[in-house]
């Protein structure tokens, strides 16, 4: 016997929680062997949107303050920029959550 009665499903309360991916800081540390020019050139080469003036400001910050945050963004990109700068011989702090 087949029933023609309508079936109902219970109403569900669904909600989607969206979490943003955490950003990470790429931090260059001061050292005694990299020149101002080399640090500035590396920032220009690897950090997107970097200008010559900004690279020089950050290089001075590295020298006088001991460190500078040169880029903040998604982890995967931060890891790439960190690795590229380290490969060029810059002294890098570990990535930090922003």
Curated annotation (Swiss-Prot):
Superkingdom classification of source: Bacteria
Alphabetical list of NCBIfam families matching this protein: PRK13019.1-3 (NF009563)
Source species: Synechocystis sp. (strain ATCC 27184 / PCC 6803 / Kazusa)
Function: Involved in the modulation of the specificity of the ClpAP-mediated ATP-dependent protein degradation.
GO biological process annotation, one example: proteolysis
SUPFAM superfamilies linked: ClpS-like (SSF54736)
Name assigned to this protein: ATP-dependent Clp protease adapter protein ClpS
Gene3D superfamilies the UniProt entry points to: 3.30.1390.10
Family, as annotated: Belongs to the ClpS family.
Quaternary structure and interacting proteins, as annotated: Binds to the N-terminal domain of the chaperone ClpA.
Pfam family membership, one: ClpS
């Amino acid at each position: 016997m087949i029933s023609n009665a309508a079936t109902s499903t219970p109403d569900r309360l669904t909600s989607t929680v969206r979490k943003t991916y955490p950003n990470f800081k790429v931090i260059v540390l001061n050292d005694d062997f990299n020149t101002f020019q080399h640090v500035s050139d590396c920032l220009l080469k690897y950090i997107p949107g970097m200008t010559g003036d900004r690279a020089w400001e950050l290089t001075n910050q590295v020298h006088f303050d001991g460190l500078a945050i040169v880029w903040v963004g998604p982890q995967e990109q931060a890891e790439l920029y960190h690795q590229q700068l380290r490969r060029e011989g810059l002294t890098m702090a570990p990535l930090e959550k922003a």
